[in-house]
Amino acid sequence: MAAGGVDVSRSSVAVKKDYDFYRNGSRDVYVRQSGRDDERRQIKRPSDHDLRRNDGRHRSRLAYEKGELREEAEVQRPSEKRRKFSPIVWNAEKVGRAPSREKTKSPFPVPTTTVISNQAVAGKTTSNDQVNALMSPEPSYLAPVQPSEALLAVKHPVDDLEEGQLEEEQVMQEDVKEGLLEEEQVMQEPNIKTSRWGTGLTSPKEELISVNVSKTNRWNRSSLTPECEEVMVSEEQQCYSSGSGSGHLSVEKLSADGNSGREYYSSDHDELEHEDQDSLTPGEMNMMFGSRSVNEFQKLNKINEGTYGIVYKARDEKTKEIVALKKIKMKEDRFEEEYGFPLTSLREINILLSCNHPAIVNVKEVVVGGKNDNDVYMVMEHLEHDLRGVMDRRKEPFSTSEVKCLMMQLLDGLKYLHTNWIIHRDLKPSNLLMNNCGELKICDFGMARQYGSPIKPYTQMVITQWYRPPELLLGAKEYSTAVDMWSVGCIMAELLSQKPLFPGKSELDQLQKIFAVLGTPNEAIWPGFSSFPNAKAKFPTQPYNMLRKKFPAISFVGGQILSERGFDLLNSLLTLDPEKRLTVEDALNHGWFHEVPLPKSKDFMPTYPPKR
């Protein structure tokens, strides 16, 4: 006691009684907590016979299955201390089988009863047994003893049952059978044949790739891991813009100026179809379950019809919004017989539904045809123009500030794709859509795919020939984002000059036109050049870069001019060696976009009357 303090007793005057049921289910033992210690008292309880009759149907199945009921070779205990078990199931995860119901006579002189579970017989104690040992101390002679096999083999005759106990045993047998049946129904092994997905309607995995997935699931991340599975993208579908682009691999009509590229051979398409075809399984093809019907849209007019699809301008009857309906044509080949849906179209749908960026076309959903229509439609936002059509309608090239505005939007959208490990593999003016608000959006992900690290071999039959980089023309199969940057350089040159930079008529002619402007490469300029399959061809020797002559800094006869910084950007994008080619991040941070004239605001970009 502190000096000068008052000695105050710590004992409680009023005794607080708290009676709690034990968690082991005993109903006859209570705890009374008072000032300093806990007293355990035995509360008077009704006769065993009454409890057996009243509580026979309320015994816990789990307690029985765990062996915590009276069973063979059990140590007897006075009847007045026999415990009843709570019907509350404390641990439903542990499921066991009911032991045998035969009884044996105890070899011990003391007629006591102690709970012996299956785990106790095996030499283990359950958590409830430990709680019982701590909460209710018993004499040492009441400790559970493991019976021998000889004792377990002894059977107790039915005549030895007490009065009323036979009825109790019958009730218990019925309860246990019902309990085991219910437990078997609940705890049965998972079987896909008996699940609700065994019917082929839908599955959890298919629900995740449902075409009605919310836009909140779209990628809004800065990067993805390179080891993630290939994003399923498509080659078959063209952008819904008019087929005015030209060149090899184009799925659109030839341009009005008569420039033509090589036809898109079916063998090239087959090679693209077979590229990583094992990445899709038949279970991932059932993605149209629960989609809306195309009858909920009113078709206004046809925008374009190509080899692989028809595009309509339509109105959503529910929201009254003008959209573009892109009809996916089904082809009869092995993939559709196996999966029921074109592989490349499935890839395109999945990647477009996963992307969320203002410079990438927005695919709202995928709808199915009517009762007699098995076609599938992509519902996309409607934009009035494509860059190829706008360039054909203009009588003069874009100004430098307008080119900067368009290039920044293109690079911004491409940065989003490359950050998410996606290569577009078909960038060209006809795959860039525009609206009357000055916005540019990338579309047509038919050849796009997700790449990883290390780089895997891909098909080189991608990208329209006029915008295809030299490494693909030379037969390279290991490539990454540098192929898109070459296409961006070709688009920039076309925006400045109003005409394609390398309009080759064949792959060989395309290479010759590239080398005629940029110079013929060698091992010093391009390490590894001679190792390409098509590098053995003899090309005219031209050691000089003639690109500056096409885009002079000063012009005395009119036409477009390009500053030093602008030429540096264009020349860096059109570097022959893909390892030295400019990346999208470096292109966005280039000084050309920060010098006068500055990029024009999208609000002040020229508008054009809609043609569709």
From Swiss-Prot:
The modification Phosphotyrosine is found at residue 308. Residues 297-593 form the Protein kinase domain. It is found in: Nucleus speckle. It catalyses: L-seryl-[protein] + ATP = O-phospho-L-seryl-[protein] + ADP + H(+); L-threonyl-[protein] + ATP = O-phospho-L-threonyl-[protein] + ADP + H(+). Keywords: ATP-binding, Kinase, Meiosis, mRNA processing, mRNA splicing, Nucleotide-binding, Nucleus, Phosphoprotein, Serine/threonine-protein kinase, Spliceosome, Transferase. InterPro entries: CDK, CDK11/PITSLRE_STKc, Kinase-like_dom_sf, Prot_kinase_dom, Ser/Thr_kinase_AS. Its EC number is 2.7.11.22. Transmembrane segments: none annotated. GO terms for molecular function: ATP binding; cyclin-dependent protein serine/threonine kinase activity; protein serine kinase activity. The keyword Transferase applies. ATP binds at residues 303-311, 326. The modification Phosphoserine is found at residue 453. Its main location: nucleus. The keyword Magnesium does not apply. Pfam families: Pkinase (PF00069). The active site is at 426 (proton acceptor). The modification Phosphothreonine is found at residue 459. Cyclin-dependent kinase involved in pre-mRNA splicing. Required for the correct splicing of the sixth intron of CALS5 pre-mRNA. May stabilize the binding of U1 snRNP to this rare type of intron with a GC 5'SS. Involved in chromosome pairing and is required for the completion of synapsis in male meiocytes at high ambient temperatures. Belongs to the protein kinase superfamily. Ser/Thr protein kinase family. PANTHER family: CELL DIVISION PROTEIN KINASE, CYCLIN-DEPENDENT KINASE G1. Forms a complex with CYCL1-1. Associated with the spliceosome. Interacts with RS2Z33. This is Cyclin-dependent kinase G1.
